C-alpha cells in the first residue's frame, strides 16, 4: 500500500517515526508531519500564510503547519499520486469525547476523509507512553485487516477512524 503518515505531535515524535519505519519496510510510505507539536489544532489549515516544507530524508518531510496542512501538502505537492490510506498518529493522548473536535490527529483524518481518501487515526490512552510498541503492532494489524477486507471496497466506504 501507499501510505501518507502524519501526526499532531510533530516530526520529532519517536512513536510516529518508529511506526513509519516499521510499516515502510513493507509499504511505500511517506512521513509528512508538522515541524513542531501542533496538538489541539483540530482540522485547522493555514489560509493566508505560506507553509514551508523541508525534505529531511527520502520520503520524510517537515511542514511548518498543522496536521491538516500536512495532508494537503502531501497530496498536492509532495507525493507522486494519491495514497491508499492516510494514517494519523500514533497520538500521545486518548482523543475521546469532547476532545475529538480539537484533536490534530483526528483533524488530519477528517481532512483525508474530506478529500475522499481513507483515514486511520491512532491514539494512546493513559498517563505513560512507555508501552507504545503494542500500539504499533495494533496499527500494523489494522492495516493488514484493511488491506485484506477493504481493498475492493468503493472509495466512499473506506473510512476507518
Please state what every model-predicted region is:
Residues 3, 13-77, 81-82:
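A cross-family phosphate/adenosyl-ligand binding-site feature
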Residues 5-12, 99-100:
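Short, glycine-rich nucleotide/cofactor-binding loops
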Residues 9-10, 35-37, 66, 90-94, ...:
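Acidic, glycine-rich active-site loops and adjacent beta-strand->loop/helix elements
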Residues 81-126:
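Internal, conserved structured core segments that host functional sites
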Residues 120-149:
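Short, glycine-/small-residue-rich phosphate/pyrophosphate-handling segment
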Residues 149-156:
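Flexible, glycine/charged-enriched surface loops at secondary-structure junctions
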Residues 160-161:
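Conserved small/polar residues in nucleotide/adenosyl-binding loops
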Amino acid at each position: 500500500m501507499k501510505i501518507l503518515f502524519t501526526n499532531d505531535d510533530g516530526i520529532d515524535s519517536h512513536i510516529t517515526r518508529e511506526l513509519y519505519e516499521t510499516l515502510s519496510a513493507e509499504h511505500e510510505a511517506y512521513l509528512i508531519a508538522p515541524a513542531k507539536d501542533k496538538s489541539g489544532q483540530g482540522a485547522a489549515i493555514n489560509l493566508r500564510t505560506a507553509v514551508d516544507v523541508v525534505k529531511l530524508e527520502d520520503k520524510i518531510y517537515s511542514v511548518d503547519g498543522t496536521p491538516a496542512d500536512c495532508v494537503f501538502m502531501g497530496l498536492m505537492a509532495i507525493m507522486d499520486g494519491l495514497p491508499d490510506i492516510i494514517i494519523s498518529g500514533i497520538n500521545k493522548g486518548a482523543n475521546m469525547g469532547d476532545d475529538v473536535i480539537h484533536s490534530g490527529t483526528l483533524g488530519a483524518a477528517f481532512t483525508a476523509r474530506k478529500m475522499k481518501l481513507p483515514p486511520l487515526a491512532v491514539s494512546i490512552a493513559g498517563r505513560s507512553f512507555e508501552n507504545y510498541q503494542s500500539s504499533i503492532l495494533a496499527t500494523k494489524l489494522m492495516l493488514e485487516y484493511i488491506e485484506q477486507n477493504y481493498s475492493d471496497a468503493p472509495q466512499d466506504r473506506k473510512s476507518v477512524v
